[in-house]
Amino acid sequence: MILDIYKDAFEFASRKISILFVLGVLSFFNILIIPAVFFYGYNYRVVKLSTQSMINGDEVPPAFDDLKKMFIDGLKFVFVFLCYLIVPAIIIVLSLSNGSINVILLVIGLILLLIARLFSYLAIPYMATNGDSLKSAFAVSEINKVMASIGYARYIISYLGILLVSVTIFIVIFVMLSFVVALFDMAVPTVYGNFIGSFLMKLVLLFIVAPYLSLFQTRCAGLIYNIG
């Protein structure tokens, strides 16, 4: 079942190249607030579609339209994640302050971070299936019931699998691109060659890899939610 979800998500992310390009542009400029909000607003739309989908179906990524609603959805998406992550983030920062590491506080922060990520990952599809209600994203007891119906062990393994697959793909592509950039620097041994090579590397990572992995992850979120 879980492997089928991964397979579906990989295929889904590659069915509409034009969307990858649009998301790539937004990803490239995501240091700016507005492009980032639209980026996450579209990802929310993918989650919502996926909660209504069958595994190994033939859905394609949704249209990039209704920008006003997409922007609002993006704000909700970001707000939900920030709210879930703010407490563990503060604890982790405090554990690293004063020039030393408080190991106990750091461990507590990392455990809370994992728990927050597990809940926030289901909070988005739960919100999408409850009338886009922001309040529903914080119905922790209800989200916990969904998690329990999926199976705690299966859900945690699925989530960690998504992270592992995403990180592995990113690292492999990063290493391959680094090798290509090194060859480019040897062929064009100037400061301009180094700049061009690094720029092309960032271009591939932000225009192709980042949007592809974001579609993969959000598609998985909606499909895993459906198991519950």
What are these regions (language model features)?
Residues 36-61, 65-97:
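Selected alpha-helical membrane-embedding segments in polytopic membrane proteins
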Residues 58-73, 98, 102, 106, ...:
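Membrane-helix interfacial "entry" motifs
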Residues 3-29, 64-90, 118-171, 218-219, ...:
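Interfacial aromatic "cap" segments that immediately flank transmembrane helices
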Residues 93-94, 165-166, 174-179:
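Juxtamembrane/interface motifs at transmembrane-helix termini
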Residues 1, 7-8, 55-58:
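Low-complexity, intrinsically disordered extramembrane tails and loops of integral membrane proteins
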Residues 28-54, 100-137, 171-181, 190-228:
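Selective recognition of hydrophobic, aromatic-rich stretches within alpha-helical transmembrane segments
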